[in-house]
C-alpha cells in the first residue's frame, strides 16, 4: 500500500505543486525590502560598530596598557605597545586595530577594566587606500572624543544589563 501511495504522489508531482503554491502565495504579499541608503532600520542600543578609545574628564586617556583586550581578542586584531612614564604608570605608545581581522565580538570592550575601548554605533565607514583598515591610537582617540557624550549615554542606559 505504501508503494502505491508513493507512486501516485510522484506521478502527480505533489511536491512540485506544493512548492509552486508556496511561491504563488508569497508573490502577492507585501515585501520586507528596505532601500538601504535612504531607509535604515533602527539600531539596537547594544550594536557593536567602529571602535573608539575614551578619555577621562580631565583629558587623560583611560587605557592603562594592561593588554587584556589584546589577549582576549579571538581574531588577533589588536596590537598594543606600552611604555612606563615618569610617574611609574604604564600608558600605550601604540594601539592598533585591524578592522579586516576584527569580528566585532565585543570581547575587548568587556575585558577592559577601565572602560577605555568601546564599540560605537558607527556602521558605515570605508577605506580608499591600502593600509587604512588599520586604525591607530590617534584615530581611535579622535573617534572617542567626537562621540564621548553619546558613548556615555549608551553605556548609562545599558548599565543595568552589564
UniProtKB/Swiss-Prot annotation:
Protein keywords: 4Fe-4S, Cell inner membrane, Cell membrane, Iron, Iron-sulfur, Membrane, Metal-binding, NAD, Quinone, Repeat, Translocase, Ubiquinone
Cellular component annotations (GO), alphabetically ordered: plasma membrane
GO molecular function, one term: 4 iron, 4 sulfur cluster binding
Residues where [4Fe-4S] cluster 1 binds: 63, 66, 69, 112
Translocase is among the record's keywords: yes
Domain 4Fe-4S ferredoxin-type as annotated: residue spans: 53-83, 93-122
PROSITE patterns per the UniProt record, alphabetical: 4FE4S_FER_1 (PS00198), 4FE4S_FER_2 (PS51379)
EC number: 7.1.1.-
Pfam families per UniProt: Fer4_7 (PF12838)
GO terms, biological process: aerobic respiration
Cofactor binding summary note: Binds 2 [4Fe-4S] clusters per subunit.
Amino acids binding [4Fe-4S] cluster 2: 73, 102, 105, 108
Subcellular location as annotated: Cell inner membrane
Family affiliation: Belongs to the complex I 23 kDa subunit family.
Function: NDH-1 shuttles electrons from NADH, via FMN and iron-sulfur (Fe-S) centers, to quinones in the respiratory chain. The immediate electron acceptor for the enzyme in this species is believed to be ubiquinone. Couples the redox reaction to proton translocation (for every two electrons transferred, four hydrogen ions are translocated across the cytoplasmic membrane), and thus conserves the redox energy in a proton gradient.
Name the UniProt record assigns to this protein: NADH-quinone oxidoreductase subunit I
Provenance organism: Xanthomonas oryzae pv. oryzae (strain MAFF 311018)
Gene for this chain: nuoI
